C-alpha cells in the first residue's frame, strides 16, 4: 500500500492507496500550527485503522513538510511535482492547473511548455485571504459563498493583500453596501489577483483543473474563474487531496508508520532561535508598571445620579462601534464598545434608545460622530457634528496630557500617529500598505494558534526568551513563527515576540522613524491594541520613555468626539441637540440599494441609504452631482483643465494614413508634442479611450508582473483598445530622457515611463501582425531628434517622408508642447489668484503627468475641491524657483518638478502640497522622503496619498480632512498667540 502525507500551511491531508491506485482512505484536517503533534496523531491513526503494523510506501509533501520529512528519514517530494504526478495519473488531458491553498496559490501549465507560477511574498488571493474576508463579514467561508450566489453587482476590491482588501471592504460595509455584493466582489478580486499576479501574461486556456480548498468549497469562485477565462473548468473528485495523492504515487520507500511517529517524537529542535530580552525582569516590575498605567483614568460618575445636559460621542470605526456619554465637566457617565457586525446603524440605534429609555427626560446637548462611518451615522440620526477621527483622538489625548507631542493610536487594522508642535498637529502618519503593526495582526496569529487574543497576549508577559521575529508582513511572519516552533520556541516566547514585532512594525515600517527620539518624549498611546500589556511594555522599552495609556484607550475617538461636542455647543450657547427623538429612533428604518451613477464619465458605484423619514444618504460618489443634481464646479481645479486640454487633441484627416497613440504614462504630457508631429506629417492621430476599469480588465491577462505600478498596468488595456481600431500603426517610443527644464542634475524619465513599450511589445499578442513603433527616440536634443527620426526611425515604417518634412513637423511639435505647458502655467496662476481672492486654501496635488488620468487618481482632485480648496499641479509652479541643492541625486524630470513645487510651497502661507504616489513605484521610495524633508524644513505639513487600483476613497478622505483640520488648528493657535501678544 502507498501512503501520501501533504502538510500544508494550514491543513494536513493524508491518503492511502492500494496497488491499483484506488483510494482506500483519506483525511483533511486543520493543524492550527501544531504540525508535529498532528502528523504523529495521523500516522498512528492510519497504522491502527488501515495498516495494522504492516509496512507501507510513504512520502511527504507540502509547504510545511520538508523539515519533518528530513527529521525522520522519509522521502520528501516537492508539492508542485506531486500535483503534476497526480494530475497526469488521474486527469491526463489537463492543460492547466489552478490551485489555491491556505497561504499559497499556483498555476501549473502542463502543455506548450511546462511551467509553474507561484505567489511569492503575498498571500492575497489564497484561502487565508478568503477566511480573513469572511471573518470581516461575520460569516463562515460557506456562508460567504452562499451569500455571493445572491449578488446583484460587484465592487472593485483589491486582493493583493488582506489589508488593502479591508480598506476596500470596510468602507463598503460602513456605507451600507449589500453583504451579498461584497462577498461576490471578494471572489472576483481573488480571480483578478490570480490571473494578473500569477499568469503574468501567459494565456490560461484549454482544459482547466481547479484544485485546493477554496476552489473545492466555493462554487462562486469557480464560476468567477470560468467567466474571467471564458472556459468551463473542472473541479475533480478528491480535489483537496491531489498533493497527497501525488506523494503517495511517488513513494518508493517503505516504513512502519508508528516507527515514523516515534522518530518524530524523538525529534528535538537542534537549532537555536534569535531572542529578545524579556519584557519584565520580575513580577514586581510588572506590578509597578500595571499600577502606573491604571492611574491614568477619566473620572466616572453614575449616570443614574446625573441631572443636566449630556454630550454623546460616537466612533463608528473600521471593525467596532464606540459610544461615550459625558457631562459638562468631561466626566464619563456611560460607555459602550462592541463589534460593528458589518452594519453599525442598528447597534447605535439600540444604544441611543437604551440611553433614552433608562434616563427619561434626559437633556442631550450635543451628539458628535467620528470614524470611518462618521458621515453615515451623522446623516442617519441627524447628529450635530462630524469630526475627522485624527482630531477626535488628539482632543482626547490633550485631556490626559495637555503638552503631548506624540500620539500613536493602534486599532484593529489601522494605525494613526501624529506629531504635535506648538499645540497643533504637525505631521500625520497612517498605515496605507500594511497592517502588520495592528491589532488584527495579533488576533490572526492568536486564532491560528488556537488561542483567544487576550489569553494569548497575557502569555507573553513573563516569557524568558521572546522570539526575535523582526518587523515583517503577516505572511512572512507566519513562516517565521512556524520556524520558531520547529526550533523549540514556547508559545509564551512566540506571543512576546509578536508583541515586540507589532511595535517595531509601527515605528520602523509605518512611521519609518530612524530613531525613537525623533518622535517625541511626551507620548499618549491609545487604541484597543494598547490594552495588550505586552505591546504596551514593548513600546515603552523600544521608545525608552514612560508613556500614558489612558484607561479608556479603546474609547479615545468617542471620548474626543464628546469633548468636541461639549466645546462647540458651549461656544454656540446650544443646550439642545438636533438628534432624533426617542419616538423617531423607534420608527427608524434603513434601506440600502446599490446603483451606478450615470451623471458623468466616472460611473461611480453609489450606495444609497434611504431612511424612514424619506431622507437619503449617498456614498461612493466622487463629486456632488448625485447629491445636488448639479455638475461639479471645476473652475479651481487644474487637473480638470488638463483633462480638457488633452481631450481637445482630435484626429485631423491626413494623406498618409492613421497613427494610434495610447493615452497612458508619458503621453499625458507629450500627447501635444506627438499629435502635432504626426499631424504635420499628414497622419490622423487617434488616441486610445480614456482609462476605465473595463479598459484595465481588458488588458489584465497580458500584465507580466503584479509589482508594476497601476499606471503601467493600465497601458496594456490601452494597447488592446488601439489594436482593435483600424490603424496603420501604433506609436509608443522608448524615451530615456525627458525635456530638460534646468531644475535637476539630469532629466531622465523613470525606467517604467522610459522603457515600458518594450514590455508591451513582448507581452501583448494583439500586437502581432501590427505595425508597432517603439524605437528609442530622444526629444531632449531637437537637432538629433530630427536626424534620428528622418534617417533611422521613419524609413523603417513609411516611405517618402523627407528630412525637411520631419524638420517642419519637429518645429510644430516643440512649439505645440511649449504652448501646452504655457497654458498650464497660465491657468495655474489664474486659479491661484482666484483662490486667494475667495480666501480658499491652495493644494498642490503633486505627482506625475499621468496622475491626471481619472482612473489613476480616482477623483482625488474633485474630492479636494469638495472640501473647499483649489487644486493646482506641480508643473504649474515648478518654474517659480531656481535649481537648489537636494539630499538625493536629482536626476528625474518629473521628480525635479516635485521638489521645486515643494520648495515653492514653503514660501506661500496659503499653499500646501499633497503627494500622489503610485503603489509599487521604486523611485518614490526616495522622492517621498526628500519631499517630506523639503516641506518640513519650511514648516509645512507633508501628506502622501498612495493610490493604485483601489477605488474606495474612505481612507484618502480621512487623510485630507486631517490635513485641513491640522491647518485650521495651526491657524487658530497662531491667532490665539497673536491675540495674547497684542494684549501683553
Locate the predicted segments by residue.
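Glycine-rich phosphate-binding loop plus the immediately following alpha-helix
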Residues: 34-35, 112-153, 240-243, 249-253, ...
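Short glycine-rich, Thr/Ser-proximal phosphate-binding strand/loop in the N-terminal lobe
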Residues: 4-45, 115-116, 120, 314-354, ...
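Gly/Thr-rich phosphate-binding beta-strand-loop-beta motif of the actin/hexokinase/Hsp70
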Residues: 1-20, 94-111, 302-333, 404-420, ...
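Glycine-rich phosphate-binding loops at beta-strand->alpha-helix junctions
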Residues: 64, 198-228, 239-243, 370-373, ...
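An N-terminal assembly and electron-transfer interface module characteristic of large anaerobic redox
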Residues: 119, 123-130, 434-442, 449, ...
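Glycine-rich phosphate-binding/hydrolytic loop that grips phosphoryl groups
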Residues: 127-132, 237-271, 395, 439-444, ...
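Conserved phosphate-binding/catalytic loops in two-lobed NTP-binding clefts
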Residues: 76-80, 226-245, 384-391, 540-559, ...
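Phosphate/ATP-binding catalytic cores across multiple sugar-kinase/actin-like superfamilies
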Residues: 182-206, 247, 291-300, 497-520
Amino acid at each position: 500500500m502507498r501512503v501520501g502525507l501533504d502538510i500544508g500551511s494550514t491543513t494536513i491531508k493524508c491518503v492511502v492507496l492500494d496497488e491499483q491506485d484506488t483510494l482506500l482512505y483519506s483525511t483533511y484536517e486543520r493543524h492550527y500550527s501544531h504540525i508535529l503533534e498532528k502528523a504523529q496523531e495521523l500516522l498512528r491513526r492510519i497504522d491502527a485503522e488501515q495498516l495494522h503494523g504492516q509496512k507501507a510506501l510513504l512520502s511527504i509533501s507540502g509547504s510545511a513538510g520538508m523539515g519533518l520529512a528530513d527529521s525522520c528519514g522519509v522521502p520528501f517530494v516537492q508539492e508542485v511535482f506531486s500535483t503534476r504526478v497526480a494530475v497526469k495519473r488521474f486527469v491526463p488531458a489537463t492543460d492547466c492547473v489552478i490551485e489555491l491553498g491556505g497561504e499559497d496559490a499556483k498555476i501549473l501549465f502542463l502543455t506548450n511548455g511546462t511551467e509553474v507560477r507561484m505567489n511569492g511574498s503575498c498571500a492575497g488571493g489564497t484561502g487565508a485571504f478568503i477566511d480573513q474576508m469572511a471573518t470581516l463579514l461575520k460569516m463562515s467561508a460557506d456562508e460567504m459563498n452562499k451569500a455571493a450566489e445572491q449578488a446583484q453587482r460587484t465592487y472593485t476590491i483589491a486582493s493583493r493583500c488582506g489589508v488593502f482588501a479591508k480598506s476596500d471592504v470596510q468602507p463598503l460595509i460602513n456605507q451600507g453596501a449589500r453583504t451579498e455584493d461584497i462577498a461576490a466582489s471578494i471572489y472576483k478580486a481573488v480571480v483578478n489577483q490570480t490571473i494578473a499576479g500569477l499568469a503574468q501574461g501567459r494565456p490560461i486556456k484549454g482544459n482547466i483543473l481547479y484544485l485546493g480548498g477554496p476552489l473545492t468549497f466555493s462554487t462562486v469562485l469557480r464560476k468567477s474563474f470560468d467567466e474571467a477565462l471564458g472556459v468551463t473548468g473542472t473541479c475533480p473528485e478528491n480535489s483537496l487531496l491531489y498533493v497527497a495523492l501525488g506523494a503517495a504515487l511517488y513513494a518508493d520507500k517503505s516504513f512502519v508508520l508508528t516507527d515514523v511517529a516515534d522518530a518524530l517524537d524523538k525529534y528535538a529542535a537542534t537549532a537555536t532561535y534569535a531572542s529578545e530580552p524579556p519584557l519584565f525582569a520580575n513580577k514586581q516590575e510588572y506590578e509597578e508598571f500595571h499600577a502606573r498605567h491604571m492611574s491614568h483614568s477619566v473620572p466616572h460618575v453614575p449616570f443614574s445620579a446625573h441631572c443636566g445636559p449630556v454630550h454623546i460621542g460616537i466612533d463608528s470605526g473600521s471593525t467596532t462601534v464606540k459610544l461615550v456619554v459625558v457631562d459638562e465637566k468631561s466626566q464619563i457617565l456611560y460607555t459602550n464598545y462592541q463589534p460593528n457586525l458589518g452594519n453599525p446603524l442598528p447597534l447605535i440605534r439600540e444604544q441611543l434608545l437604551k440611553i433614552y429609555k433608562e434616563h427619561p427626560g434626559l437633556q442631550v446637548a450635543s451628539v458628535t460622530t467620528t470614524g470611518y462611518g462618521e458621515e453615515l451615522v451623522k446623516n442617519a440620526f441627524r447628529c450635530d457634528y462630524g469630526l475627522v477621527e485624527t482630531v477626535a483622538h488628539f482632543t482626547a489625548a490633550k485631556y490626559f496630557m495637555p503638552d503631548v507631542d506624540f500620539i500613536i493610536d493602534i486599532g484593529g487594522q489601522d494605525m494613526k500617529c501624529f506629531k504635535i508642535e506648538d499645540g497643533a498637529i504637525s505631521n500625520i502618519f497612517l498605515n496605507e500598505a500594511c497592517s502588520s503593526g495592528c491589532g488584527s495582526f495579533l488576533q490572526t496569529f492568536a486564532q491560528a494558534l488556537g488561542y483567544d487574543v487576550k489569553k494569548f497576549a497575557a502569555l507573553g508577559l513573563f516569557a524568558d526568551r521572546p522570539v526575535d521575529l523582526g518587523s515583517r508582513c503577516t505572511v512572512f511572519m507566519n513562516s517565521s513563527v512556524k520556524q520558531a516552533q520547529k526550533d523549540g520556541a514556547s508559545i509564551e516566547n512566540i506571543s512576546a515576540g509578536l508583541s515586540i514585532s507589532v511595535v517595531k512594525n509601527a515605528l520602523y515600517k509605518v512611521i519609518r522613524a530612524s530613531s525613537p527620539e525623533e518622535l517625541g518624549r511626551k507620548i499618549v498611546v491609545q487604541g484597543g491594541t494598547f490594552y495588550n500589556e505586552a505591546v504596551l511594555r514593548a513600546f515603552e522599552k523600544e521608545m525608552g520613555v514612560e508613556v500614558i495609556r489612558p484607561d479608556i484607550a479603546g474609547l479615545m475617538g468617542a471620548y474626543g468626539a464628546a469633548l468636541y461636542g461639549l466645546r462647540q455647543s458651549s461656544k454656540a450657547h446650544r443646550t439642545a441637540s438636533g438628534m432624533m427623538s426617542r419616538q423617531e429612533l423607534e420608527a427608524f428604518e434603513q434601506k440600502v440599494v446599490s446603483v451606478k451613477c450615470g451623471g458623468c464619465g466616472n460611473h461611480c458605484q453609489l450606495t444609497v441609504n434611504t431612511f424612514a423619514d424619506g431622507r437619503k444618504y449617498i456614498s461612493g460618489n466622487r463629486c456632488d452631482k448625485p447629491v445636488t443634481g448639479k455638475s461639479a464646479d471645476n473652475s479651481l481645479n487644474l487637473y480638470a483643465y488638463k483633462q480638457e486640454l488633452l481631450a481637445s487633441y482630435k484626429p485631423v484627416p491626413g494623406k498618409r494614413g492613421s497613427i494610434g497613440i495610447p493615452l497612458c504614462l508619458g503621453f499625458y504630457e507629450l500627447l501635444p508634442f506627438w499629435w502635432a508631429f504626426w499631424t504635420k506629417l499628414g497622419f490622423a492621430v487617434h488616441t486610445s479611450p480614456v482609462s476605465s476599469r473595463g479598459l484595465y480588465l481588458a488588458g489584465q491577462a497580458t500584465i507580466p508582473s503584479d509589482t508594476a505600478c497601476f499606471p503601467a498596468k493600465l497601458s496594456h488595456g490601452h494597447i488592446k483598445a488601439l489594436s482593435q481600431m483600424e490603424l496603420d500603426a501604433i506609436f509608443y517610443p522608448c524615451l530615456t530622457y525627458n525635456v530638460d527644464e534646468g531644475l535637476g542634475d539630469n532629466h531622465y524619465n523613470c525606467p517604467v515611463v522610459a522603457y515600458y513599450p518594450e514590455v508591451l511589445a513582448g507581452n501583448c499578442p494583439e500586437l502581432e501582425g501590427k505595425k508597432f513603433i517603439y524605437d528609442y527616440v530622444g526629444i531632449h536634443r531637437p537637432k538629433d531628434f530630427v536626424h534620428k527620426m528622418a534617417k533611422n526611425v521613419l524609413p523603417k515604417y513609411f516611405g517618402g517622408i523627407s528630412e525637411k518634412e520631419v524638420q517642419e513637423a519637429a518645429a510644430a511639435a516643440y512649439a505645440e508642447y511649449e504652448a501646452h505647458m504655457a497654458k498650464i502655467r497660465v491657468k495655474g496662476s489664474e486659479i491661484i489668484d482666484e483662490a486667494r481672492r475667495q480666501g480658499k486654501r491652495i493644494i498642490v496635488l503633486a505627482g506625475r503627468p499621468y496622475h491626471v488620468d481619472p482612473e489613476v487618481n480616482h477623483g482625488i482632485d474633485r474630492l479636494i475641491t469638495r472640501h473647499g480648496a483649489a487644486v493646482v499641479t506641480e508643473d504649474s509652479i515648478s518654474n517659480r524657483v531656481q535649481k537648489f541643492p537636494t539630499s538625493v541625486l536629482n536626476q528625474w524630470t518629473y521628480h525635479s518638478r516635485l521638489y521645486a513645487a515643494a520648495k515653492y510651497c514653503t514660501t506661500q502661507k496659503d499653499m500646501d502640497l499633497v503627494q500622489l504616489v503610485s503603489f509599487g513605484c521604486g523611485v518614490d521610495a526616495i522622492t517621498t522622503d526628500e519631499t517630506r524633508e523639503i516641506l518640513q524644513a519650511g514648516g509645512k505639513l507633508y501628506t502622501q496619498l498612495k493610490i493604485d487600483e483601489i477605488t474606495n476613497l474612505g481612507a484618502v478622505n480621512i487623510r485630507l480632512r486631517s490635513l485641513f483640520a491640522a491647518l485650521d488648528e495651526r491657524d487658530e493657535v497662531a491667532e490665539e498667540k497673536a491675540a495674547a501678544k497684542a494684549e501683553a
